[in-house]
Amino acid sequence: LEKLIMVLQKELTCLGGAVAVPYKEKLFAILSNNCNETIRKIGAINCIFRSNPNDQFFSCTNTDGEGALEPLANILGGTKPLNIGLIGYGGAGKAIAGFLQQYKDKHEILLFNRTLPNKKFSDELEINFIDLKELPSKIGEIDILINATSVGSQNNLNEKLIRREYLHKLKNSSLVYDIIYDPTETMLLRDSKEIGLDVINGMEMNLLQAVLAYKHTNNTTLSLEELKKIMGSSD
């Protein structure tokens, strides 16, 4: 893999590209010196690109986290302090946690997972890691609940992340966000909607991470909105 990257870097007609599982962490290890501090804390990349067309080396980023938070930009950028509950610390969860860091002085960020990360990750991200078993006792405090696990996806359709009785503990004003896009309505979102909560699915994140990757790779001056329209959606 490292030899391949060295060859591609020398070929200036190769602008970059997308990085998929299982190479996100492996490529990060090779290109970590060319990432910003946020990406180093995440420890995984999904996009390589040249910051300048004549650069001899690839830069790298992770558009999963940036794409996931874009639909929440107006809420997160508001003046009201919020409690944000993020469930899952896999590839997408790490990316979202890394980009949520920019809001840690304004909002309380709680990361729920079945297993707790080592102290190094916890200290670097400066986020409160909590055992998933404690979610039922904490859920009533949460303003934005984000599912970054695969529970509820096509491969796990019959699995339930949170029992409906626990969703009833959420505030009436709470927002439930599931980054899964297939199906477009997971059991978590269906239950939340029936309770009367606002919900967001993963369709926009899926588009935005690709739009952002295209923008990086092609070094374009087109705006995010212009690229969204070109790539199939302005919603």
Question: Which residues make up each language-model segment?
Answer:
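Short glycine-rich anion-binding loops that position phosphate/pyrophosphate groups of nucleotides
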Residues: 20-26, 92, 150-153, 182
